[in-house]
């Protein structure tokens, strides 16, 4: 099967760049949801803890169970709130408060403009009263920015809305809560930082999705994807390759199959516009479930070493390229 290589040096470089923005490693919450954006949940959690990260964010309690002993706090974004000494749970609506287990540690999400998850600002006082009545421990209040990675003033508009939320929470008597709103994009573009945490995902893994005008933070991709040779054959001019015979050899050539396909989470794409690998080789014909064909006889080839560049070829985003990669692919750490 294919292999994913995790570059420890690049990961720590990115975390250092983010710490320079926040002023402290203590303020970084590493986002590890969805198998750490495809990089490997337990592997990236261990590297993060080794670096000194004390806070993590995951999608489910199942993910949290695998890594929570490594961190001081773990925020669970999408699961039922239960009582736990380390985990806190996002409250995305008033019903979440009603359904939370007595005494659970919770973090209230407020919708400041994304209109995806979170209570409406006008529901804030009611939500706080419900939290008190249910005897829940409110440890945080948060929001999420819908367009921090785009030009325009929407980020600042949402920040203004959240500033009002913070004041109202304090006025209601909740003084010992942590406030957080910054994702990777907001963190990288902000000149000042005055919150308790940043929730850093894609930035930690080496990708700055901001417009070029903000591209002054040197991040380095952490993940590379390689495939091993299965078989080699010599094609004659005119012979066709793979399902549908979409590729026709223009001359006599040597081709090999490599152990990567859409069954591993690799994008099938369009054989009329073939993907060009990190080594400059186009995939020949259609991507199969378990194989791709390339003009090479090398034992191993690097297919992708920059998910952002790869994503542009497929008309998608770096997030999708990495999170789609199968959990069954072996992941290895290299120091550099």
Curated annotation (Swiss-Prot):
Which positions are annotated as binding substrate?
A: 116, 289
Sequence intervals crossing the membrane: none
- List the GO molecular function terms: alanine racemase activity; pyridoxal phosphate binding
Q: Name one GO cellular component term.
A: cytosol
Per the UniProt entry, the Enzyme Commission number(s) are: 5.1.1.1
What enzyme category does the UniProt record give?
Answer: isomerase
Name the CDD domains for this protein: PLPDE_III_AR
Task: Tell me one Pfam family matched here.
Answer: Ala_racemase_N
What GO biological process, any one, is recorded here? D-alanine biosynthetic process
Q: Which catalysed reactions does the entry list for this protein?
A: L-alanine = D-alanine
Q: Does the keyword Isomerase apply?
A: yes
- Which keywords does the record carry? Isomerase, Pyridoxal phosphate
- Sites of the modification N6-(pyridoxal phosphate)lysine? 33
Active site: residue positions: 33 (proton acceptor), 243 (proton acceptor)
Question: What cofactor does its activity depend on?
Answer: pyridoxal 5'-phosphate
Per its UniProt record, what PANTHER family does this chain match?
A: ALANINE RACEMASE, ALANINE RACEMASE, CATABOLIC-RELATED
Similarity annotation: Belongs to the alanine racemase family.
Q: Please state what the protein is called.
A: Alanine racemase
User: Where does this protein come from, organism-wise?
Assistant: Sulfurovum sp. (strain NBC37-1)
Which lineage?
A: Bacteria, Pseudomonadati, Campylobacterota, Epsilonproteobacteria, Campylobacterales
User: Gene encoding this chain?
Assistant: alr
């Amino acid at each position: 099967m294919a292999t994913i290589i995790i570059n420890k040096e690049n990961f720590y470089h990115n975390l250092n760049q983010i710490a320079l923005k926040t002023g402290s490693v203590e303020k970084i919450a590493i986002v590890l949801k969805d198998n750490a954006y495809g990089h490997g949940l337990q592997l990236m959690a261990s590297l993060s803890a080794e670096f000194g990260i004390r806070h993590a964010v995951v999608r489910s309690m199942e993910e949290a169970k695998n890594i929570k002993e490594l961190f001081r706090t773990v925020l669970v974004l999408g699961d039922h709130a239960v009582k736990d000494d380390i985990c806190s749970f996002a409250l995305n609506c008033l019903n979440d408060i009603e359904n939370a287990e007595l005494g659970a540690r919770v973090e209230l999400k407020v919708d400041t403009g994304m209109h995806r998850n979170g209570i409406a600002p006008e529901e804030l006082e009611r939500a706080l009263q419900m939290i008190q009545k249910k005897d829940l421990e409110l440890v945080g209040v948060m929001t999420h920015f819908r367009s921090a990675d785009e030009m325009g003033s929407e980020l600042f508009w949402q920040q203004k809305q959240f500033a009002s939320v913070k004041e109202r929470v304090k006025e209601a008597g909740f003084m010992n809560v942590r406030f957080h709103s910054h994702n990777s994009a907001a963190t990288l573009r902000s000149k000042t930082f005055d919150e308790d945490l940043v929730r850093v995902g894609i930035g930690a893994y080496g990708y700055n999705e901001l417009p070029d005008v903000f591209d002054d933070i040197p991040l380095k991709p952490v993940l590379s994807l390689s495939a091993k040779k299965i078989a080699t054959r010599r094609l004659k001019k005119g012979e066709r390759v793979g399902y549908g015979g979409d590729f026709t050899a223009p001359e006599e050539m040597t081709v090999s199959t490599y152990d990567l396909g859409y069954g591993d989470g690799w994008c099938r794409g369009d054989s009329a516009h073939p993907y060009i690998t990190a080594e400059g080789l186009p995939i020949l014909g259609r991507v199969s479930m378990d194989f791709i064909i390339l003009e090479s006889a090398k034992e191993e080839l690097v297919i992708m070493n920059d998910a952002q560049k790869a994503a542009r070829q497929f008309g998608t985003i770096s997030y999708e390229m990495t999170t789609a990669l199968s959990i069954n692919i072996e992941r290895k750490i290299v120091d550099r």
